[in-house]
Amino acid sequence: MSNYDRVPCSIAIPNQQVEIQQQPRVFEDQESPVKTKVQQPPPEQVRVPPTVIGATATAKKKSCLSTTSSRKEPPAHPALRRKTVAFGRTVNVSQTVEGTSRHTKKAIASPSQNHRMTEENQEENWRDVMKNEFEVMRKEMQEEATKKQEELNAQNLNKMQEMMSQFFQQITVAKPSAEESQDREKENWYEQSRHARQQKPANKIAKAREIIKREGSIPPEALPILEQRIRTDPMFRQQIDNVLADAECDANRAAYSPLPPLSPPSGRYANGSSGNPALMRETLTVERSIRYDNGLSSIDSRQWTSERNDNRTHDNYRPYEPDPQLQSMYQKGQSVSYYPSEAVGKAHRNNRLEYHVEEVPEYEEEETEVGGRGRGRKYHEPMETESAAERERRIREKYSRRK
C-alpha cells in the first residue's frame, strides 16, 4: 500500500494502460501523430483516514502531482524522441521532463556533492585548527622573549646601580691629612726625577742625531743606545735610515754648492749696516774677484779658477778654513788686458776663439777709463760735438729721403 493511501483527501489513481504509437519522422520540427486511448477513471472512492500516529503525522508531505509509477525509458535513437518547444527553441522532451528534472539531477549529484562538501569542510576545519595552533605558539614565543628582555633589563639596572654606588663612594672619600699630602708630594718628586732620568737617553739620541747630520758619523757614546733601540724598535730603524739618507743628501748638496770667498769680509762690511759689498765689486783685485764669474774676467783668471776648483774636491767633507789673504800682483805699467776680437765677422763678445792684445804704455794708463761705455778711449782725444743747426739739417735730410 502506497503512502498516498494513508494521506487524507488524496486521490488514488489505479495503473492505467496507455498505448503510444510512435512513427519515424522526416523533419525533427514536426511531431509524429500520437494516438492515445485513455480509459475512463472509476468513480471516486473516499476512504476514512486511519488513526494517525506521531511518526506519520510528522512525515513530510509530497506533491500531489508526483506519481509513483516508474517512467518509461526514452528511446535511444534521437529521431524517436519526442519534441517540444521550451525557452524559445525545440528540444527533446527527455531534456525537460523525463531525464532532466531537478529532482533527478539532485538525486544523481547528491553523493558526489556531499562527499566534496565533506572534504571541503574537513579542510576548512584543519586550517582553522592550524591557525589556532600558530596563534598560540606565536603568543607563547612573544611572552618568552618579553620575559627574557625584562630579566636582562633588570640585570643591567642592577649593574648600573652598583657602578654608580662605587663611583659615589670614590667621590666622597675623606680629604687626606697633611702628612699624607707631604708623602704624596715626595712621591711625585721622586717620580719626576725618575722620569727625567728616563728621558736622558732620548736627549743623547737627539744629540747623536745632530752629530750624524752634521758630520756624517755616529759618535761612540751613542752606539750602545742605538744598538738597543735598533734591536727592539723597528720604527727607530726606519728613522736611522732616514737620518743617514738626509746626511748623504746634504753632503752631496754641499759638494756642488759654490764655495765661500777666500778672504774674510772687512770690518767695514762686517755688520752689514753700512752698505752692500756687491756694489763695491769693481774695487776688488783680480785675485779676490775670481768668484764673481760674470763673463768679464780674463782667460788666465778663469783657467786658474777651474784648476783651483778641481784641486779642492778633497775638502768637501771638511769644515771650511779660509785661505790666507793673497797679495795683488798688479804692477803699474805692466798690466795686460785681453778682450774678444770683433774684427773677424763681427763675432759676439762671448765668442772666445780669437783674441787680440792691446798694450797700453805707461804714460797713457792714468788717462784710461776703468769702466763704462768708453772703455780704452783716451781723454785727450777730442769728442765729436754736433751743433743744433747740423742736427736739424741731418734730420731734414733723413725725412726728405723717406719721401
From Swiss-Prot:
Q: Where is this region: Disordered?
A: 24-79, 96-127, 174-205, 255-276, 302-325, 355-403
Q: Does the keyword Coiled coil apply?
A: yes
Q: Which domain of life is it from?
A: Eukaryota
Q: Where in the cell is it found?
A: Cytoplasm; Cytoplasm, Cytoskeleton, Microtubule organizing center, Centrosome, Centriole
List all Basic and acidic residues biased stretches. Answer: 116-127, 177-194, 305-321, 379-403
List the coiled-coil residues. 128-163
BP terms from Gene Ontology: centriole replication
What the entry lists under InterPro entries is as follows: Sas-5-like_implico
Query: Where is this chain compositionally biased, Acidic residues type?
Result: 360-369
What range does the record give for the signal peptide? none
Gene Ontology cellular-component terms for this entry are: centriole; cytoplasm
This protein's UniProt keywords: Cell cycle, Coiled coil, Cytoplasm, Cytoskeleton, Developmental protein
Function per UniProt: Required for centrosome duplication. Essential for daughter-centriole formation. Requires both maternal and partenal expression, suggesting that it regulates centriole duplication during both spermatogenesis and early embryogenesis.
* Complexes and interactors: Interacts with sas-6 via its coiled coil domain.
**Name used for this protein in its record:** Spindle assembly abnormal protein 5
**Organism name:** Caenorhabditis briggsae
